[in-house]
A protein has these predicted regions:
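Membrane-anchoring alpha-helices and their flanking helix-loop junctions
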Residues: 1-79, 96-157
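Histidine-centered phosphotransfer motif of kinases
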Residues: 80, 84-93
């Protein structure tokens, strides 16, 4: 085991811990900002949709689900369901939740939302390197499937 891979579990725990802290910071209740009421409702809908997306994607992984970017021993390369639209649907849901919280809580949530975005982007890149090593088909999947935001596809007539 080389020096770099020996530290991966510790780095993974640190990343997951930071993610938990940032999500707590986003979820912490605050007095509503002076945004228009409609904007706050849009934020609530976005946050709820983000939770649903993350939850459905997590359930789809079944026993292979792990908060760590290190793939579990039961991990398989998933190309179906939400994983056919984006490579990281759980992270996509969390990013949508963070954007929604910005609309419902205002400036008080900018720092945790930006930090969460940067952390999830870094975790995704790390996870993709590990998945490429473990699954030979991963690079072709990554080349055709967006990371976080689904591509708009034209309908065929």
């Amino acid at each position: 085991m080389d020096e770099r891979s020996r530290h991966q579990p510790c780095t993974a725990v640190a990343a997951v811990s930071a993610q938990a802290i940032l999500l707590t910071g986003l979820a912490w209740p605050v007095r509503p900002p002076p945004h228009p009421r409609t904007l706050r409702w849009i934020g609530r809908v976005m946050s709820g949709a983000g939770l649903v997306i993350a939850g459905v994607a997590a359930a789809g992984l079944g026993p292979a689900l792990t908060p760590s970017p290190l793939p579990s021993t039961q991990a398989q390369l998933r190309r179906d369901g939400m994983f056919g639209r984006v490579r990281h649907p759980i992270y996509s849901g969390l990013l949508l939740l963070g954007a929604g919280r910005l609309l419902t809580a205002g400036r008080r949530r900018v720092a945790p939302a930006v930090a969460l975005t940067l952390l999830l982007a870094a975790k995704a890149r790390w996870e993709e390197r590990l998945m490429s090593t473990r699954f030979p088909d991963y690079p072709s999947y990554a080349a055709t499937t967006p990371r976080f935001i689904p591509a708009m596809r034209r309908s065929r007539k």
